[in-house]
Amino acid sequence: MIPNTNYSELKDSYLFYHIAQKTKAYLNSHPDSYLYRMGIGDVSLPLCDAVVEALHRAVDDQSQKSTFHGYMPECGDPGLRETIADYYKKRKVSLLPEEVFVSSGASDELGDILDLFGRDKTVMIMEPAYPAYVDANIIAGNRIIHIPSGKENGFLPLPDETTAADVIYICSPNNPTGAVFNCEQLKLWVDYANRIDAVLLFDAAYEAFIEEEDIPHSIFEIEGAKTCAIEICSLSKTAGFTGTRLGYTVIPKELNR
């Protein structure tokens, strides 16, 4: 066997597992305490009725010869892809259903998408960041440029013309800070990516939490983004069913890398 030695560069344990272990230990020794859980972004309410009813119908369909099916289409259910494309119309973003790819969730896709770029790439990650970004790129053997953020830039770093990368991760609203890029700030990143032939991986998992009308939910609300960006979203957050594993990725036909 030829091992992937990049695994040895990972931290000893996954961040959320480490937090869960510390939480369990604390509650065992302080049984009367209540902890506000600020770790993994899990839900606190049961699935809504519409989701539960749809799951039941789907299971029942598998028990009848007339409605049973095996594998779904490779890129996802056509009706779901069309519905997702229609969802973007609310933000005046025009997508074709064939530009939408249904996945088993954003966490998996944020790592799997790297297979499109080959190996030995330079990747830019804004810190603090969702742990999956770093772990996936360590495993892939990519070079990582960590872009710091803090009070001085509102946790929203902007492009540095002296630095270049092949792939740039942007999460807005950010996990874990909650900071959100406005249109002008995202336009700077889009123009920068187009200038240096980079691809923006836009993590829109928390887009449904945006309340301000003038804040973009999608990178594709920004002019020029379709030639440089891929967007990944999670129904765990949008529809509130973590653990059900459903998300999607948008890759525009205009992407020219």
Task: Identify what each model region corresponds to.
Residues 36-38, 124, 145, 201, ...:
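Hydrophobic/aromatic beta-strand patches that form the interior of the parallel beta-sheet core
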Residues 66-191, 207-222, 226, 230:
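Conserved core of the PLP fold type I
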Residues 172, 200-201:
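Residue-level marker for buried hydrophobic side chains located in beta-strands
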Residues 215, 221-257:
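Active-site PLP attachment segment
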